[in-house]
UniProtKB/Swiss-Prot annotation:
It comes from Caenorhabditis elegans. The gene is mtx-1. Its main location: mitochondrion. It comes from the Eukaryota. This is Metaxin-1 homolog. InterPro entries: Glutathione-S-Trfase_C-like, Glutathione-S-Trfase_C_sf, Metaxin1/3, Metaxin_GST, Mito_Protein_Transport_Metaxin, Sam37/metaxin_N. Pfam families: GST_C_6, Tom37. Belongs to the metaxin family. The keyword Transmembrane helix applies. Associates with the mitochondrial contact site and cristae organizing system (MICOS) complex (also known as MINOS or MitOS complex). It is found in: Mitochondrion outer membrane. Keywords: Membrane, Mitochondrion, Mitochondrion outer membrane, Protein transport, Transmembrane, Transmembrane helix, Transport. GO terms for cellular component: cytoplasm; SAM complex.
Length: 312
């Protein structure tokens, strides 16, 4: 079985949310899946990564997380994901997964795909540099339109408010535990890790969601725990990512500086009195001249004489 995921960066084995969920789940149950970093999403039936290619028989590739979890349960490895959960706990897990998809996932998509500053500074640059031209233009446009459709009808404030509540709910549920269902990871832990890890690790100029996540120390500890136990990076990969760190820091710093400059300019323009439009100024001038002329004639300052033509 092969798991095709997006490449690694920013201290993560892959920067994609769903790719992280697939990878974390496979590692938590010690599945002998072969991981392949790919930049060819067109090979997937959904046109997206991750994709699980099953080498046995003629099984179709899998791109759905729940279906992947079902496959892992039937693989026969020693560690079976979610095997120790009761029926009630499994129902709670399903309910929590649905809650996160509706309240946290939209904010993650907004942060990386529809926030103009984050998209132009990080997302667009990263994917454009990993995909060949002109396919990168098509793919970025497709992904962004998909995110915009997902968020249609919601404003930024509403999206972030729901996400903040979701993070607080996650923090409360985790408490002081190592994982969300005790001391043994479940598919919920893989799901949550995929949502949180990019928010925590990827540098962003608009970092409101990152700040809120950082204010929940137990969630930060959870991400670090999963990363160190199940998804550690090799030395070569760490060196490669370290080489790109200055470039990303420069891009983020420039984006933040441009943001502050634009904010200062906007505040300065708002503090200036509004100048009347040119049309209004011209009409006002003509009106004033007309009134002055009428007043002058009425008071006798200007006299108008009419001479009759004498016919011979």
């Amino acid at each position: 079985m092969e798991l095709h995921i997006w490449p690694s960066d920013f201290g993560l084995p892959t920067i994609d949310v769903v790719s992280l969920q697939f990878l974390a789940c496979s590692k938590m149950c010690a599945s002998p899946v072969r991981v392949i970093q790919s930049t060819r999403p067109w090979r997937s039936p959904s046109g997206e990564l991750p994709m699980v290619a099953q080498t046995e028989g003629e099984a179709k590739p899998v791109t759905d997380f729940e279906k992947f979890v079902d496959i892992l349960k039937k693989c026969g490895q020693d560690v079976v994901i979610d095997a120790d959960l009761t029926t009630i706990e499994k129902a709670q897990l399903d309910a929590f997964s649905c809650y996160l998809h509706h309240n946290l996932y939209p904010a993650v998509m907004h942060t990386f795909w529809t926030d103009e500053l984050n998209y132009n500074t990080v997302t667009q640059y990263w994917y454009a540099s990993h995909l060949h031209f002109p396919y990168n233009l098509y793919y970025l446009e497709k992904r962004r339109k998909k995110a915009l459709r997902l968020l249609a009808g919601k404003n930024d404030t509403e999206i972030l408010k729901e996400a903040f509540m979701a993070l607080n709910t996650l923090s409360t549920k985790l408490g002081d535990n190592k994982f969300f269902c005790g001391n043994k990871p479940t598919s919920l832990d893989a799901l949550v890790f995929g949502y949180l890890a990019p928010l925590l690790r990827v540098p962003l100029p608009n970092d409101r969601l990152q700040v809120q996540l950082s204010a929940c120390p137990n969630l930060v500890r959870f991400v670090e725990t999963v990363s160190s136990i199940y998804l550690p990076l090799g030395e070569d990969e760490l060196k490669r990512q370290q080489a790109n760190r200055k470039m990303w820091q420069s891009r983020i710093s420039k984006a933040k500086a441009d943001k502050e400059a634009a904010k200062t300019t906007e505040e300065a323009s708002e503090s200036l009195p509004e100048e009347p439009p040119m049309r209004d100024a011209i009409l006002f001038t003509l009106g004033a001249l007309t009134l002055s002329l009428v007043f002058a004639i009425h008071t006798g300052l200007i006299q108008v004489s009419v001479e009759e033509e004498i016919s011979e």
